[in-house]
């Protein structure tokens, strides 16, 4: 038996619960940055390592080595009597889940997969994730795992193709239809599309929430992060990626934030600029002001060209002049 989790938060507790089998982490942050179609294997790892290292201020080779180990670890699924996937409902987990359902079906065809994926648990007013649970609670969940059926894999595969496509139309179709086979996927994919610049101000939802946090007197990176996390219906973004978004907002020709200090994260504070206040008032457009190239999954947002933006009234993206 093999257990796979998109992080290392519960792996030791699975041992404490007495669950048999090896435990593996596979945690590519696919909800951040470029995930273009047509790129796999070493080329995909190289792209992802470069992106993660740049955003999180890490060494590229160290990140690449870690991603390579994670991919190599998936080969342990070959020949297993069962592979158990441990997930929750948020965007981070759901993007990893659709990738793994597709990937494991390809590298270990015929190996039975089972899934634990929840959005709530008894005793928690607000359930964040499996990391909240102790060994006994995780052991009880193991007994409630459900087998992954072929139609669940097909749903995941279609969603992954749409996620990596340069045009969000297929994602919109999936979201509209719903994903009862993977019940948390549609909401997660909609949250993904909300990371596009919005029509009204050119900010992603995360960027807007960061500015709102600072306007509400959260000034340190950690305080801003907590404020943004509390605003999320399903918390999904790690602190280092959100810190990178804070740095973005404090840079460029018209910064929305003023940064004091450079010793991350404890020696840094932020305050709003005139641009930041104008953005929150709907009187400026962040994407136009800064013209910074971006990727949201497979969607490329080049500077100075028509790009996909999230339209709040429609609840989905529209192609708009940059």
Describe the predicted segments one by one:
Residues 223-229:
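A short acidic, leucine-rich amphipathic alpha-helix
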Residues 135-215:
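A conserved mid-domain beta-alpha-beta active-site/ligand-binding segment of alpha/beta enzyme cores
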Residues 1-62:
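A structured, charge-rich N-terminal accessory region that forms the first stable segment of a protein
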Residues 56-106:
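Long, hydrophobic/aromatic-enriched structural stretches that serve as scaffold segments
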Residues 116-140:
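Short, conserved secondary-structure transition motifs
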Residues 213-223:
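Short capping segments at the starts of secondary-structure elements
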Residues 252-322:
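C-terminal engagement modules used by replication, chromatin/transcription, nuclear envelope/ESCRT
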């Amino acid at each position: 038996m093999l257990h796979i989790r998109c992080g290392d938060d519960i792996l030791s507790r699975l041992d404490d619960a007495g669950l048999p089998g090896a435990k593996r982490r596979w945690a590519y942050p696919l909800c951040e940055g470029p995930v273009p179609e047509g790129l796999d294997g070493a080329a995909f790892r190289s792209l992802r390592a470069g992106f993660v290292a740049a955003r999180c201020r890490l060494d590229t080779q160290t990140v690449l080595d870690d991603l390579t180990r994670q991919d190599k670890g998936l080969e342990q699924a070959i020949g297993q009597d069962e592979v158990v996937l441990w997930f929750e409902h948020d965007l981070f987990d759901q993007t990893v889940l659709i990738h793994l359902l597709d990937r494991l079906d390809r590298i270990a065809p015929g190996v039975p997969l089972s899934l634990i994926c929840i959005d709530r648990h008894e005793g928690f007013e607000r359930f964040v994730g499996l990391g909240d649970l102790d060994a006994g609670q995780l052991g009880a969940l193991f007994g409630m795992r459900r087998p992954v059926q072929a139609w669940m894999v097909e749903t995941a595969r279609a969603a992954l193709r749409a996620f990596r496509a340069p045009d969000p139309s297929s994602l919109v179709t999936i979201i509209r239809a719903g994903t009862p086979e993977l019940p948390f996927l549609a909401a997660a994919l909609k949250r993904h599309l909300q990371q596009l610049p919005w029509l009204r101000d050119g900010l992603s939802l995360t960027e807007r929430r960061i500015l709102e946090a600072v306007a509400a007197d959260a000034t340190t990176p950690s305080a801003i992060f907590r404020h943004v996390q509390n605003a999320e219906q399903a918390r999904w973004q790690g602190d280092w990626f959100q810190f990178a978004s804070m740095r973005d907002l404090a840079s460029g020709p018209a910064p929305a934030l003023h940064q004091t200090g450079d010793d991350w994260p404890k020696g840094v504070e932020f305050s709003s600029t005139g641009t930041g206040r104008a953005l929150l008032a709907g009187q400026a457009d962040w994407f136009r002001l800064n013209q910074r190239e971006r990727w949201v999954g497979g969607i490329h947002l080049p500077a100075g060209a028509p790009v996909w933006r999230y339209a709040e009234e429609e609840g989905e993206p529209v192609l708009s002049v940059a």
